[in-house]
Amino acid sequence: MRLWTGLGNPEPGMSRHRHNIGFMAVDEIARRHGFSPWRKRFRGETSEGVIGGQKILLLKPMTYMNRSGDSVQQAAQFFKIAQDDITVFHDELDLAFGKLRIKRGGGAAGHNGLRSMDKCLPGPDYWRVRMGIGHPGHKDRVTGHVLGNFAKAEEPELERWLEAIADAAPLLAKKEHEAFMTKVALLAA
């Protein structure tokens, strides 16, 4: 089993914030691949399904960003999921909007959700799907940027991008990370 976690904040008014792009990604994966209805457990919401022959547990921590690791740790321990089988979808300031990169391990780069996961898991050696939201230009504008909605002009591209991520998910399930990134880029173009 693989654990795919989308990071975000649970408030309904925050659902379209840039910081919630991880939630948006796992919601689209669940929808496109006919996963089970979301249910509350592990201090979050989970949905289960199969992609590319691989059983996937989707998780949206309902603990707010700063405590996301608590929820991920509970799910990983319950199902005995190794760190190499954990993937987190999160917003990334240092990538332009619409760009996506995958890496394993590394630092939190100021991201409180990743920092929480690093504290709660045995270490930082899980996979990260870094979803670019762009940088507002000055550090004083970062909070307003990540806690703001996507611009109306970005919405069509955002929807194509989320659909591309869901459509390419079978490659991610097989851990074909380079092929996944390439397919997302091609489908979202």
From Swiss-Prot:
<feature type="site" description="Discriminates between blocked and unblocked aminoacyl-tRNA">
    <location>
        <position position="9"/>
    </location>
</feature>
<comment type="similarity">
    <text>Belongs to the PTH family.</text>
</comment>
<dbReference type="GO" id="GO:0000049">
    <property type="term" value="F:tRNA binding"/>
</dbReference>
<comment type="function">
    <text>Catalyzes the release of premature peptidyl moieties from peptidyl-tRNA molecules trapped in stalled 50S ribosomal subunits, and thus maintains levels of free tRNAs and 50S ribosomes.</text>
</comment>
<dbReference type="InterPro" id="IPR036416">
    <property type="entry name" value="Pept_tRNA_hydro_sf"/>
</dbReference>
<feature type="binding site">
    <location>
        <position position="64"/>
    </location>
    <ligand>
        <name>tRNA</name>
    </ligand>
</feature>
<dbReference type="InterPro" id="IPR001328">
    <property type="entry name" value="Pept_tRNA_hydro"/>
</dbReference>
<keyword id="KW-0820">tRNA-binding</keyword>
<feature type="binding site">
    <location>
        <position position="112"/>
    </location>
    <ligand>
        <name>tRNA</name>
    </ligand>
</feature>
<dbReference type="GO" id="GO:0004045">
    <property type="term" value="F:peptidyl-tRNA hydrolase activity"/>
</dbReference>
<protein>
    <recommendedName>
        <fullName>Peptidyl-tRNA hydrolase</fullName>
        <ecNumber>3.1.1.29</ecNumber>
    </recommendedName>
</protein>
<dbReference type="InterPro" id="IPR018171">
    <property type="entry name" value="Pept_tRNA_hydro_CS"/>
</dbReference>
<feature type="active site" description="Proton acceptor">
    <location>
        <position position="19"/>
    </location>
</feature>
<comment type="subunit">
    <text>Monomer.</text>
</comment>
<keyword id="KW-0378">Hydrolase</keyword>
<keyword id="KW-0694">RNA-binding</keyword>
<feature type="site" description="Stabilizes the basic form of H active site to accept a proton">
    <location>
        <position position="91"/>
    </location>
</feature>
<dbReference type="GO" id="GO:0072344">
    <property type="term" value="P:rescue of stalled ribosome"/>
</dbReference>
<dbReference type="Pfam" id="PF01195">
    <property type="entry name" value="Pept_tRNA_hydro"/>
</dbReference>
<comment type="function">
    <text>Hydrolyzes ribosome-free peptidyl-tRNAs (with 1 or more amino acids incorporated), which drop off the ribosome during protein synthesis, or as a result of ribosome stalling.</text>
</comment>
<feature type="binding site">
    <location>
        <position position="66"/>
    </location>
    <ligand>
        <name>tRNA</name>
    </ligand>
</feature>
<keyword id="KW-0963">Cytoplasm</keyword>
<dbReference type="GO" id="GO:0005737">
    <property type="term" value="C:cytoplasm"/>
</dbReference>
<dbReference type="GO" id="GO:0006515">
    <property type="term" value="P:protein quality control for misfolded or incompletely synthesized proteins"/>
</dbReference>
